[in-house]
């Protein structure tokens, strides 16, 4: 695999190869909050953690074992909660790993795992857990999980070490991906935060899920009833939705969600204010030749930049493209490269 540093214009510079030493296909790679560590996971059932120095992975990786099937995804918690990593697998389990110091960590069976310890195990799903995501840090240590059993589970970690679990059906034919909304949304377009209504700035628990039913669904937490309720169902795709990503909206008006599908399209769902409806528009990878919204192959992953103004799209043909919204021109591809 490679690391691709980006310059300010959203152009990718030369790739930095990473020899992961995985023995099978790599499914995910995630940098931590500071960009100092890289976690990867693979069908070889392992997780590997590298130190990143000046944009390059250095030294031998820490290898975390315990899953009994392919590991689909890893997710770093905010550093305010410690050095914590979550992983999910085809084996139907979610593991929470914590760095506890060299020589102190013990995994299942008591083996040392290079200073990392598996501190929690979530086993309530009955099929593959395909996606995991930590909530914005100001909501607390909360992890959401999406599974092929059609359910979503939300794990809230308590101060006494216990976990409060809320699990509910989300997509009848399987949930493939999950992404949290910013906890404080820019609710009034063009109005500064100091002028926003006070109740609009309260932290809000909300996320979006993608399913094998070709739909994406938006869920919000009802504080009075203490349960998750469906707020919106958004149609548009004609096949499984493989991934979904809610854009950070730091300094940006409105809300954006990107979804990627087996139907070879990427849709941008936008909502300028809470009083308006969601609208959807496809990316057009064939411009200027045509208005065809189809990529060459199924689209597997979408990911926003930290500022929420650049979208990365990973296609099954092995290429990654970067997209920005032009002024009055829709979304434009500003860079692409082979992975």
Swiss-Prot record:
Give the highest taxon in the source lineage.
Eukaryota
Which PROSITE patterns does this one have?
A: WD_REPEATS_2, WD_REPEATS_REGION
**Claim: Cytoplasm is one of the keywords in the record:** no
| Annotated compartments | Cytoplasmic vesicle, COPII-coated vesicle membrane; Endoplasmic reticulum membrane; Nucleus, Nuclear pore complex
A Pfam entry, by short name = WD40
**InterPro entries, alphabetically?**
Sec13/Seh1_fam (IPR037363), WD40/YVTN_repeat-like_dom_sf (IPR015943), WD40_repeat_dom_sf (IPR036322), WD40_rpt (IPR001680)
**What GO cellular-component annotations does this UniProt entry give?**
COPII vesicle coat; endoplasmic reticulum membrane; nuclear pore outer ring
Give the membrane topology: Peripheral membrane protein
Which terms does the record give in the GO molecular function aspect? structural molecule activity
> Quaternary structure?
The COPII coat is composed of at least 5 proteins: the SEC23/24 complex, the SEC13/31 complex, and the protein SAR1. Component of the nuclear pore complex (NPC). NPC constitutes the exclusive means of nucleocytoplasmic transport. NPCs allow the passive diffusion of ions and small molecules and the active, nuclear transport receptor-mediated bidirectional transport of macromolecules such as proteins, RNAs, ribonucleoparticles (RNPs), and ribosomal subunits across the nuclear envelope. Due to its 8-fold rotational symmetry, all subunits are present with 8 copies or multiples thereof.
Instruction: State the protein's name.
Output: Protein transport protein SEC13
Please report the organism this UniProt entry assigns to the protein.
Cryptococcus neoformans var. neoformans serotype D (strain B-3501A)
Lineage, broadest ranks = Eukaryota, Fungi, Dikarya, Basidiomycota, Agaricomycotina
Name the gene.
SEC13
């Amino acid at each position: 695999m490679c690391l691709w540093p980006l310059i300010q214009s959203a152009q990718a510079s030369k790739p930095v190869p990473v020899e992961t030493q995985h023995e099978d296909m790599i499914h995910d790679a995630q940098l931590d909050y500071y960009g100092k560590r890289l976690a990867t996971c693979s069908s070889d059932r392992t997780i590997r953690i590298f130190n990143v120095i000046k944009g390059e992975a250095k030294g031998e990786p820490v290898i975390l074992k315990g899953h009994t099937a392919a590991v689909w995804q890893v997710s770093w918690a905010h550093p305010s909660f410690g050095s914590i990593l979550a992983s999910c697998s085809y084996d139907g389990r979610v593991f929470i790993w914590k760095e506890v110091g060299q020589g102190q960590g013990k995994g299942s069976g008591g083996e040392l795992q290079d200073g990392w310890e598996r501190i929690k195990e979530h086993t309530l799903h009955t099929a593959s857990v395909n996606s995991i995501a930590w909530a914005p840090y100001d909501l607390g240590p909360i992890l959401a999980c999406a599974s092929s059993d059609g359910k979503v589970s939300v794990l809230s970690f308590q101060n006494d070490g216990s976990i409060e679990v809320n699990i509910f059906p989300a997509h009848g034919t399987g949930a493939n991906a999950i992404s949290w909304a910013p906890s404080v949304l820019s609710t009034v377009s063009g109005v500064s935060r100091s002028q926003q209504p006070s109740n609009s700035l309260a932290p809000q628990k909300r996320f979006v899920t993608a399913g094998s039913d070709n739909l994406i669904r938006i869920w919000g937490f009802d504080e009075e009833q203490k349960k998750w309720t469906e707020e919106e169902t958004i149609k548009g795709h004609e096949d499984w939705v493989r991934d979904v990503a809610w854009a950070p909206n730091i300094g940006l008006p409105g809300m954006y969600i990107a979804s990627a599908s087996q139907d070879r399209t990427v849709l941008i769902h936008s909502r300028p204010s809470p009083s308006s409806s969601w609208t959807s528009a496809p990316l057009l990878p064939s411009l200027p030749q045509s208005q065809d919204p189809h990529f060459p192959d199924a689209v597997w992953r979408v990911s926003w930049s930290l500022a929420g103004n650049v979208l990365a799209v990973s296609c099954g043909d092995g290429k990654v493209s970067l997209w920005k919204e032009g002024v009055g021109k829709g979304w434009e591809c500003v860079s692409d490269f082979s992975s």
